Amino acid sequence: MQFIEVKNAIKLLKNPKQNIAFLDIRERKQYVQGFAFGTINCPLSKFKTTIKDLVPDQSTAILFIGIKNTAQTIKVGRITKSLNYKNVFQIEGDYKKWKKEKLPIWAGEYTFSKAFGEWIEITSEVKNLFPKQLKKIHQKPNNYLQIDARPKKEFEKFTLPNSVQCSGGELPCFINNQTNLKKDYIVHCAGRTRSIVAYQTLKDFNFKNEKYVLNGGTQNWVLNGYDRDFKNKSKIKSTKLNFKSDLNLANQIAKKFNIPKSSQKNKNHSCHYFQLNSEIKNFKKIKGWKQVNATTLVQNTDKFIASTKTKIFIFSNIPTSAVFATIWLRRMGYNAIWQIKNPRSFKKSYSITKPDPTYFFPKRHLGNKSHSRGYLNWEHSLIPTIRKWGCKQPWVSANQNNLRDVKHTIYKVYKNF
């Protein structure tokens, strides 16, 4: 592993031709309190298994920060060498030098995806509904389908009165039937990002019905003095699948956004391969493909992907779900590709990706109003922070249909330094 001066690290980070992974090896609890923009957390305690998943291409230029002593330098160097990574650099002076040079630092959990969600709200012109308005809607007959866009496990811990559950990646399939097409829609999550993604997805897939986002989700509901529902049971498995109709819709939307497709059978171990889990129906798992919920892949992207240009193949037995994930990853600047045919299994193993403990405003989902308010204010601060760094267009507009060409935000931010 080579040392690299900060100024030369910035040259790498602003070069759009360079496939780069910027990794912070500190433990999660410390990392979320403040980290260099664009860094992905790869904690030293589970470094070897995590880096293989985050950076499958051994030729990727890897920048390390958060290394506190010689022993850690030696350990990181030894492991990366054993895994045959070829371009590995440690930033000289680490965070002390980074801060001295006034280079971009922010904080939080899944911050890149959260900021992206805020950008989508701005450029999509999302229609917001507020808790007091929703409470009034609940008090009289209405034609709204109120959808909690989080995965089943989260929904069953707590949700809002009158909500049904459908994770955002399966919304097109869930909506595209005679019953639900006659409804208008209110989407929510626990905060903001996944409901914004769900709202835009309804627009992306050409559902013309009236639609709203519950501003601030369950956290804002609690802040307004209303009670959540607990221990609900999702009925998502009762959704009837029409594969032909779903495939037709998927092809129509893939054409609309000009997203790349693949039917390749030979696997290159230097790429990402994701098979999207369905909560509607259990499908056979394909060996060599990492299993993930589509919405989680978009919401918690930095748990799965660190490289800026590595190819990402997306497969789902529900075609609209694969198109959903491909669209969103490409909007974020990743090189995602829709795998249109059932892929062959191959030999590739992955570590189990477990949810992290909540360290950032940790009591926000436990009814703590101070933490909820602080968290929502933090989300609102993300785009102003990026703009303060001189980056006015960190991602493409939500209204841009042509997603053939993509560029990662890391290049757009660091070109200003």
Q: How should each PLM-predicted stretch be described?
A:
Residues 1-21, 25-145, 149-270, 276-417:
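Rhodanese-like catalytic fold shared by cysteine-dependent sulfurtransferases
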